[in-house]
Amino acid sequence: MKKPYLLFFLLISLILHSCSVNHAKINNDLKKYFDSSNVEGCFAMLNNQMGDITVYNMNLDTQRLSTGTSFKVIETLIGIQTGRITNEKSTLGNDSSSKNVTLQQAFQNNSVPYFQELARQIGKDTLQMWLDSISYGNSKITSAVDSFWLNNDLKISPDEQLGFLSKLFFEQLPFQKYAQETVANLMKKEDTSLYSLSYATGLGIDEKNNSFAWNLGWIEENRHIYFFVTFIRTPVKSTNTEDRVIEISKSCLKELGFFKGQK
């Protein structure tokens, strides 16, 4: 399924990793979806076929921001690569709060205890090696191995997340093909006759005590693939940031003409 896209990926890979900002189209029409939810945020999309990038809020799109629990995407890749977990049904036996939780459940629910235990089992040096190997954001681990992504050590920009997503989809990351396929399967949310939608969310609290949320994914229509990243933050303590970032993502996609099978 992915082979028809591969040529386009190779052609735009330099854009993704060196000068995507210079090729971006600014779309301020998307601002209303963030305003209506009373959040600050950004949205970025890559049209893989054309190499076009659409951005709302370029300033935020190029800032490195705390990963929060969106770290689960790369941590799952590392966990499978190192054999600490093997598939979607993998459980972790050492931590009482997560020993009966499967990878699939933890991934869907942003389970902090599960991914903390997985990080402890992988180890700090191994995690650091893999973060460095793909230049994942600032690749910074300065606090404890089971909390650095929660304590605002590890940061990545939405623009960098977009490049990471495209490599994941095309299995171009330095991980086993099986690991990348497993993560892609965990991200799949909707599969209809008109479109297929995949994404992973991430939550957290930043240094200024803002609640924030990520939504990272791709949508496919008529064998055309589009990658997107949404980030939101609010100074108001909120328990529904995940719902809001998903809703905003879908509103932006709808504004851009998706979900009709006509792209």
Place the predicted regions along the sequence by residue.
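Structured C-terminal helix/loop/strand segments within mature extracytoplasmic catalytic/sensor domains
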Residues: 21-31, 37, 120-123, 169-192, ...
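Active-site SXXK
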Residues: 64-88, 106, 228
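Active-site helix/loop module of the DD-peptidase/beta-lactamase fold
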Residues: 86-109, 126, 130-140
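Mid-domain, small-residue-enriched loop/turn segments at the edges of structured enzyme/sensor domains
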Residues: 117-170
